[in-house]
Each structure stands twice: as C-alpha cells, then as structure tokens.
A protein has these predicted regions:
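Positively charged, small/polar-rich N-terminal and surface patches that mediate targeting and assembly
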Residues: 1-103
Length: 103
C-alpha cells in the first residue's frame, strides 16, 4: 500500500493545553481516525538552535521527539490542518512510503 510517512518534530517537554505536545498529537490523530502512531525520543541531535545531547543536564526537556504516522496523503494533510488550527508551529516531514507485511 502506498502511503506517506508523516513525521512531526517536537521538544520532549513542550506542552499544548497542559498536555505534552507529542501526547496531544497522538490524541489528535486518534480523534481523526488514524489507527496508529508512535513517538520516538532521541539521544542526541542538532539543529539551527545548536546541539542537544541527553548527557547535558541543563538541556533536559529540549531533546527532539519524532511523532510518526503512516497514512494516506489526504489524511496527513487533515492532521497538519488540525495542528495548524490549534496554533502549533511545528516542523514536519512528509515522505512517500510503502507498507507491507513479510511472509
């Protein structure tokens, strides 16, 4: 099945309406009828605002979390609209993907 992999990037401690942003994203996706999604924590990374590493105590809560969904492109667009309508400004990637099951 040809779908897209929608990856949304958030800071691990960021919140939206009192809920961790990655939890809010998973809940919003479930409300749209998306049947599955995952949030992955990172060990280290860097971006335009510098390097982040789990070993730096003072950076606690600033490591990225990737929230990932494999859905049809139209569903990904619906979720991105929900995110925008909620006033969240988040970085995302939408990549072509193929889902299958091994025998």
């Amino acid at each position: 099945m040809n779908v897209v992999c929608l990856q949304v990037f958030v800071s691990e401690a960021s919140r939206h309406h009192g809920k961790l942003t990655y939890e809010w994203l998973l809940d919003a996706a479930q409300e749209l009828g998306i049947t599955g999604g995952s949030a992955f924590g990172t060990l280290a990374g860097f971006g335009r605002h510098s390097r982040h590493d789990a070993g730096f105590f003072e950076l606690a809560g600033e490591l990225p979390v990737v929230v990932e969904f494999f859905v049809e492109a139209a569903i990904a667009d619906q979720l991105l609209k929900v995110i925008a309508d909620a006033g969240l400004k988040l970085v995302y990637a939408k990549l072509p993907a193929e889902l299958g099951v091994t025998l």
